Amino acid sequence: MDRRASSASHLVSGALGGLVAVVLGAILIATGVIDTGDETVVRQGDTARPVAGGNGRDAATVNEIYRRTDAGVAFIQASGGSTGASPIPGLPQPPEGQGRSTGSGFALDDEGFILTNAHVVEGADEVRVRFGDQDSVKVQVRGADPSTDIALLKVDPGKVKLRPIPLGDSSKVRVGDQAIAIGNPFGLEHTVTTGIVSALQRSIDAPNGFSIENAIQTDASINPGNSGGPLLDGDGRVIGINAQIETGGGSRGSVGIGFAIPINLAKRVIPQLKEKGKVEHAYIGVTTAPVTEGTEGIDLPADKGALVQDVAPESPAAKAGLRAGKTQTDEGLVVGGDLIVKVDGIAIDEPPDVARAIADNKPGDRIAIEYYRGKKLRTVVLTLGERPKRVPQQGGRGQEPDQPDEPKPDKPFQLP
C-alpha cells in the first residue's frame, strides 16, 4: 500500500472526525446535554425500548426477558465416562479436563424435567445441575436421542426451586425475528446474548451422523458451554435449543452463525424420552443428492428430486429394491441411480424432503415411494425400519446387476 495515500486518508478521517465532534458538541450544548457553567448537568436518557415479539407486537425488553427467564436456565456439569469431546465439529461443548464437560439446559416443568443437548451428557457417569445461586444437585438422565441431539434430565423437584420457561412454536418463527440466547459459555454463567433469526430450515449433523432438519440459524452469539440452553423469542418463549456453531475453520468461538434445534421437534420426542428413555425414528436407508448444476447433461427425467447415491445393506430401501448409481462424476456425484420424486404422497424437491416426509411416521409403518428408474416412473411400497444408532457406512450402492429389475413390495397395499 502507498504510505502517502494511507497517511492522507488518515488525515482526512481525522479532519472529518474533528468536524463531527465540533458539530456534535454544538448540538449537545444547544440542547442542554452539556452545561458550559461550573455545574455539570446530566439528562436522563430514554427508557429501554421493547423489542418486537415473535408475533410482531411490542414485547418486553431484553433485560425484562432475562430477569424473567434466567432463573430457569441450568448450569450443567457432566463427569466421568467419555464426556468432554464433541463427536462433530461445531458442537459447542468445551472439555474441562479428562471426562468432564459443561453445558446449559432449562427447566421444562414443575415436575423436575430439564431439557438439554444429548452431546452434553453423552457417556457421563454423573450429571449435576445448578439453577441460579442454588446448590448443585445430582440429576438422572431420563433419556437421550442422538438423532435429534436432545436429552431429558430429571431432578427431584423437592430439592430445587424450579422456574420453567414457557415453550413457543417454532413453526411460527420468521426470519428477522428477535432471538435471545441464555447460557453458560466457557463456564460464564448467566450470560445473555441477542440477535435475530438469520435463516430457517437449515440442515445440521446430529451427533450420530444423521441430519437434523429445520434447524434455526441465529446470529445471537453461541459459544462452547451454550449447548442445551434456550433460544428465546421476543416474548421470552423457547423457540429452540442451542446446539451448534459455525467456527469459521479453526476458531472455537462464535463467528455469528449458530444453530438451534427447533422446539417443535423437542415437543415430539419428549413423550418417548419420558416413557422409553429413547426415541424410535423411522428409517428408509438411502443416501441422496440434489438435482443441481452437477447433474446437467445426465438427462434426468425431472428437474427436482432426491438422486439415490447409496443404499444401506439390509435396509428397507435395499429390501424394496431401490438402486444407487454406479458412475461417479468429476463433481463426486454418483449417477445412474433411482430418482425419488414422492414419498408417502409428499413431493420431494430436494434430499431433506425425504426425512421430512417420514418424520411423523414410526418404524413398521408402510409407505409408498415414487421414483424414476431411467425414464420410467415407478412406485414401490416398503415397511419403514428403525433408524440405527449411527449412520451406516456407505458401500452398498444398491443392487447388483443380476438382481431382479423390479422392486418387491412386502405385500399388496392401497396406494395413497
PLM regions with names:
Residues G337:
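Conserved catalytic motifs of ABC-family nucleotide-binding domains
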Residues K326-D330:
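Surface-exposed intrinsically disordered loops and tails
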Residues K375-L377:
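Short, exposed coil/turn segments at beta-strand boundaries within extracellular/luminal domains
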